[in-house]
Design a protein with these regions (language model features):
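Gly/Thr-rich phosphate-binding beta-strand-loop-beta motif of the actin/hexokinase/Hsp70
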Residues: 3-21, 97
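Nucleic-acid-processing active sites and adjacent nucleic-acid-binding tracks
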Residues: 24-48
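Phosphate- and divalent-cation-binding pockets in alpha/beta enzyme and binding domains
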Residues: 37, 60-64, 139
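Conserved DEDDh/DEDDy metal-dependent 3′-5′ exonuclease domain
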Residues: 43-81
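A short alpha->loop->secondary-structure connector
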Residues: 65-72, 88-91, 148-153
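Short alpha-helix plus adjacent loop in nuclease-associated cores
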Residues: 73-110, 114-121, 162, 260-272
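Glycine-rich, often acidic, oxyanion-interacting loops/wings at catalytic, nucleic-acid
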Residues: 124-214
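Phosphate-backbone recognition surface of nucleic-acid-processing proteins
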Residues: 214-217, 223, 227-281
Length: 281
């Protein structure tokens, strides 16, 4: 094998299908590996291009392949899907990945470092706490509303009102439900503490990070957006040819419809990119 040879890997938790494509697009290898056997096999191969669909654990396998001396390419699942023929099987998926890696218009996804993955995970954990708190807030309001108890808008208004609602014996709230509401109230308070702790740690990490601090100098970019831009653009966008490519990566360019030499620019496309980051920006 050589760097012109493509090793396409269809990832899963325990079973991995590999398709090796030669320079003249002939399938040299088409077999399934276990996790341990794939590592051993990759280590024995000569330096090649390892193409992987960007899914769960893709960054781990890309970095491992690079340690073994290979060149790696992470490809968007949407791009790979164009080249899938026949039924969706591990074999066909691996072949589609191999074919996609050979296309002239393929736009590889940058492999994230361990530091970037850790920052991304911490932000997802914080977002999970926030989502859980919103869900708990809405659940409490809907339960109380069924018994004719309304609370002013805002999450803080609800939390302040809960103790008084539980102590009011004349509001028609069944005794069997008061204990459940109290537990939900305590759960909300625990989530609020977790959010504050997580946000504080995240802010410290961002302030100590030189690239994030650089991004915060941009107008309208705070801690959360600086982290989002760093994770989306990598090394402050050094891998992009120009600012337009970077803007397209995060979904801030208008959708284009061209035909017959006429170009029509539409609204901001919502087809790609990080929806959370795009909405924040």
């Amino acid at each position: 094998m050589s760097e012109n040879t493509v090793i396409a890997i269809d990832l899963a938790k325990h079973s991995f299908h590999v398709c090796v494509l030669s320079t003249d697009n002939k399938v040299l290898t088409d077999k399934t590996f276990t996790r341990s056997s794939l590592k051993t096999w990759l280590l024995k191969q000569k330096p090649s291009l390892v193409a992987i669909e960007a899914c769960g654990s893709a960054h781990y396998w890309a970095k491992l392949s690079e340690q073994y001396g290979h060149t790696t390419m992470l490809i968007s699942p949407r791009f790979v899907k164009r080249f899938l023929s026949g039924h969706k099987t591990d074999k066909n998926d691996a072949l589609a990945i191999a074919i996609a890696s050979r296309q002239p218009d393929v736009k590889p996804i940058q492999v994230k470092t361990d530091e970037q993955l850790a920052l991304q995970a911490s932000e997802r954990i914080r977002e999970h706490y926030v989502d859980e708190q919103i869900a708990t807030n809405n659940l409490l309001k809907s339960i109380l509303y069924e018994f004719g108890i309304t609370v002013a808008k805002g999450k803080r208004s609800l939390v302040k009102a809960i103790p008084d609602i539980l102590e009011d014996a004349e509001n028609g709230l069944p005794d069997v439900l008061r204990g459940e509401i109290h537990r939900l109230y305590q759960f909300w308070l625990e989530l609020d503490e977790l959010i504050q702790t997580s946000s504080k740690r995240q802010q410290q990490s961002i302030n100590a990070h030189p690239k994030c601090s650089m991004l915060k100098a941009l107008d309208g970019v705070g801690d959360v957006n600086a982290l989002g831009l760093y994770l989306a653009l990598g090394d402050t966008g050094a891998s992009f040819k120009n600012g337009r490519e970077a803007a397209a990566c995060i979904g801030l360019t208008p959708k284009q419809h061209s035909t017959g030499g006429k170009t029509v620019m539409l609204g901001i496309s919502k087809y790609i990119a990080n929806k959370k980051l795009r909405s924040n920006l």
